[in-house]
Each structure stands twice: as C-alpha cells, then as structure tokens.
Amino acid sequence: MSRRGTVEEKTAKSDPIYRNRLVNMLVNRILKHGKKSLAYQILYRAVKKIQQKTETNPLSVLRQAIRGVTPDIAVKARRVGGSTHQVPIEIGSTQGKALAIRWLLGAARKRPGRNMAFKLSSELVDAAKGSGDAVRKKEETHRMAEANRAFAHFR
C-alpha cells in the first residue's frame, strides 16, 4: 500500500460579481498571458451586451448556450492492428462543459467583429438560439460518433 496521500479534486471557484462557476470557467479559458483582469473585463462587457440584445437574464442565456453546445459523445482515435479507428466514447458532464466552453470561445475568436466582447456575446446568443459555429461543431462531433458506431466495442 502506498504511503502517498490522496488528492482531493479541485472544485471550480465562483467569480466575484455573479458568484457563478460557469462564469469563472469561461474567464479562465478567455485568459491569455496571465491577464485575468482583462479576461474579466471582456466577459463582463459581453454579458452587458447580451443583456442589451436579448433583454433577458444574461446568465440564463449563458447557461442555455453552454447546455446547447455540450456534447454527450465524442470520438477518440485508437490504434487497433495497425489501423487507427475513431472510437465513440461517452463524455462526462465536467469534460462536456469544458469542451463546450472551448468550442464557444474558438467560434467567437473566428467571428468577424470589433472586439472580443462583441464577438463572444454574438456567439453566446446564437448558441442559445441553437445556431452558430459552436453548435455546428457539436452536431458534427455527434455525426462522427454516429458514423463510427461500429467501432464502439473497441473502447
């Protein structure tokens, strides 16, 4: 038996204004070069823009967008007998949220527009409505998993 202690899983902290873990996860993914205050500014501006566009609670729009982009299943490359197969695997809720946030930010960065806050707010509103690049990415992932269903037994 090992003498090493067990490590407790870290829980995501909540942000200072909205007291929301999802907001904090999003800020940590926006973060570049350790400039966290800038990441907070970008997200809070985006939230303000969402409030102006939709005239509803921006946090509910954020939750709806992330829920709409979160994948249930993904494909993972696995080598079997010299050939690589795309094996569909189920994704847990935490990993799914992390993927959804990554896809939302990637889609927002690709968008044309003035600044990141504007692009992020547009992408979040689109994702909440069920359109946008991030939702397309999720559907594409699900299609890939469905197409490679025959390899599910390689898990």
Curated annotation (Swiss-Prot):
Report the InterPro entries cross-referenced here: Ribosomal_uS7, Ribosomal_uS7_bac/org-type, Ribosomal_uS7_CS, Ribosomal_uS7_dom, Ribosomal_uS7_dom_sf
Q: Where in the cell is it found?
A: Plastid, Chloroplast
Q: For this protein, what is any one GO molecular function term?
A: rRNA binding
Q: Which UniProt keywords apply?
A: Chloroplast, Plastid, Ribonucleoprotein, Ribosomal protein, RNA-binding, rRNA-binding
Which domain of life does the protein's organism represent? Eukaryota
A GO-annotated cellular component: chloroplast
Record carries keyword Transcription regulation = no
> What's an example Gene Ontology biological process for this entry?
translation
Under PROSITE patterns, the record lists: RIBOSOMAL_S7
Question: By its UniProt entry, which NCBIfam families does this protein fall under?
Answer: rpsG_bact
What this protein is reported to do is described as: Component of the chloroplast ribosome (chloro-ribosome), a dedicated translation machinery responsible for the synthesis of chloroplast genome-encoded proteins, including proteins of the transcription and translation machinery and components of the photosynthetic apparatus.
Give the similarity note: Belongs to the universal ribosomal protein uS7 family.
Self-association and partners: Component of the chloroplast small ribosomal subunit (SSU). Mature 70S chloroplast ribosomes of higher plants consist of a small (30S) and a large (50S) subunit. The 30S small subunit contains 1 molecule of ribosomal RNA (16S rRNA) and 24 different proteins. The 50S large subunit contains 3 rRNA molecules (23S, 5S and 4.5S rRNA) and 33 different proteins.
The protein depicted here goes by the name Small ribosomal subunit protein uS7cz/uS7cy
Organism of derivation: Spinacia oleracea
* Gene name as annotated: rps7-A
